[in-house]
From Swiss-Prot:
Protein family membership: Belongs to the FIS1 family.
Subunit organization: Interacts with PEX11A, PEX11B, PEX11C, PEX11D and PEX11E.
Organism, scientific name: Arabidopsis thaliana
Name this polypeptide is given: Mitochondrial fission 1 protein B
This protein's domain notes: The C-terminus is necessary for mitochondrial or peroxisomal targeting, while the N-terminus is necessary for mitochondrial or peroxisomal fission.
Entry keyword Transmembrane: yes
Tree of life domain: Eukaryota
Protein encoded by which gene: FIS1B
Cellular component GO terms, alphabetical: mitochondrial outer membrane; mitochondrion; peroxisomal membrane; peroxisome
GO terms under biological process: mitochondrial fission; peroxisome fission
Subcellular location: Mitochondrion outer membrane; Peroxisome membrane
Length: 167
């Protein structure tokens, strides 16, 4: 388990240093053991600086979870953190994670809003630009699917109407 937590912390460290992958589809997933480890670390944290660091790790793990309930918990934590942030770099990190959480939960509109705020803070962020592209691609894909469903429904109704008129 310590090795798994070590890998997560390395990923978190890479994320915060900008070395993490820029593709929104390549984010790592966390399991419940990693989240439990982050929760334990937070509970054991003594000073305020360490607690803030542990909260960020936990929120990172939650939005990268396989479980939708964990993702929602991470979103709630990050929403509370974003309100009180004055540091531009920390705000960018939180907005990116919040956008990723919304993206993973299927709320693409909120995800896009957060990633645009993130890009206002740091326009050159490759991660944020990649996530924005993934969000926009997904919105377009969902729109095309929606149009396809509507066209199919109209075709079915027209077919039924034509069949009734022939009878």
């Amino acid at each position: 388990m310590d090795a798994a937590i070590g890998k997560v912390f390395d990923s978190v460290s890479d994320f915060f240093s900008g070395a993490a992958s820029a593709s929104a589809d390549e984010f790592p997933l966390c399991d419940s053991d990693i989240i439990s480890g982050c929760e334990k670390e937070l509970a054991e944290a003594q000073d305020e600086g360490r607690k803030k660091e542990c909260i960020m790790r936990l929120s990172w793990a939650l939005v990268h979870s396989k479980m939708p309930s964990d993702i929602q918990r991470g979103i709630a934590m990050l929403e509370a953190l974003v309100v009180n942030d004055t540091s531009a770099m920390k705000l960018r990190e939180k907005l990116y994670l919040l956008a990723l959480g919304y993206y993973r939960s299927g709320d693409f509109s909120r995800s896009r809003d957060c990633i645009e705020r993130c890009l206002e803070v740091e326009p050159e962020s490759g991660q944020a630009q990649a996530l924005k592209k993934a969000i926009e691609d997904r919105i377009v894909k969902d729109g095309v699917i929606g149009v396809g469903i509507a066209v199919t429904a109209v075709g079915v109704v027209a077919g039924i109407a034509a069949a009734i008129l022939r009878s």
